[in-house]
Amino acid sequence: MSEQPAVAAGQAVLVTGAGSGIGLATVQALLQAGHPVYAAARRPTHLQMLQDLGAHALPLDVRDADQVQAAAQHLQHQGLGLWGLVHNAGVGGLGVLTSWSDTDLHDLFNTNVYGPHRLTRALLPLLLAARGRVVCIGSQGGSITSPFMGPYTMSKHALEAYAACLLQELTPHGVAVSIVQPGAVATDIGDNGRVANVARLQSTAAPFDAAAAAVLQVLHEAPALQSDLPESNSNRRYASPQAVAQVVMQALFDPSPQARYLVGTRWEGDRVVQALTQRLLDAARSPSHQWTEEEFLAHCRRAWRDA
């Protein structure tokens, strides 16, 4: 890369996975609003592109503890502090749950869960000093799951718990924590792991082989959106990365940010709320509770009023 641009004074924000998709859209939104941005990415082509946009390009693989520490030291030496940390770097993955090797599962968690933890820990002194913000890019898969999406949604469930605990621990010290839950978004996260996904699906053994073949067909021949038909699992409406980035901006700069932002279509939101409601019902009906319908509804009404 050529010489880095100077990082302007102000509310500096670090965005991981900044080379494409939601990360790139967030960098662009931040720059447009006049904020200094540390744009973290792995690929040299992405780093050069981010630098050309006016961001401070930061080589960073969140799986690499040495790179994480080097990034933290670099920010310390810049002397600008750090207002916001956006955990966007992530990987996906398809395949029947039992087809995943220990190594593949660990690699996925290393990026999606351990990576945010490493970076938060390294940058915590700066965030505490600024009384700033941490924003985790989760997924609606952090609340629900579906066949062939097990490991990915496991990692997003873990990130949900991580963000919830971090919120409780950091709020007393002035740092706000939010998690953004997009639904289907037009990004290249699926393309990045396409070769591994196809290989895993092609090698799926009975009794899961027929279902895996159906998923493979969708990967190879993704059906066009039927705008005149209701949205469904097979007829999805994709949000733009820019729409998610605007929600990230709210989480970063609203005076009273929400703990959770659900982003997507009404169909996606209904699906999440229904799944969470079923989980509540399962707990309320457990042998140790056995709530009546009225007790359950009274609890929901109180929660709604207190929110």
What are these regions (language model features)?
Residues L53-D66:
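Rossmann-fold cofactor-recognition segment
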Residues V96-L97, D104-H106:
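Substrate-binding pocket helix/loop in short-chain dehydrogenase/reductase
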Residues S139:
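Residue(s) in the substrate-gating loop at a strand-loop-helix junction
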Residues P172-P257:
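SDR active-site lid
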Residues W100, T145-T153, C165:
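Active-site loop-to-helix junction immediately N-terminal to the catalytic Tyr of the SDR YXXXK motif
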Residues T120, S155-A158:
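Active-site helix of classical SDR
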Residues G19-S20:
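Conserved glycine-rich cofactor-binding loop
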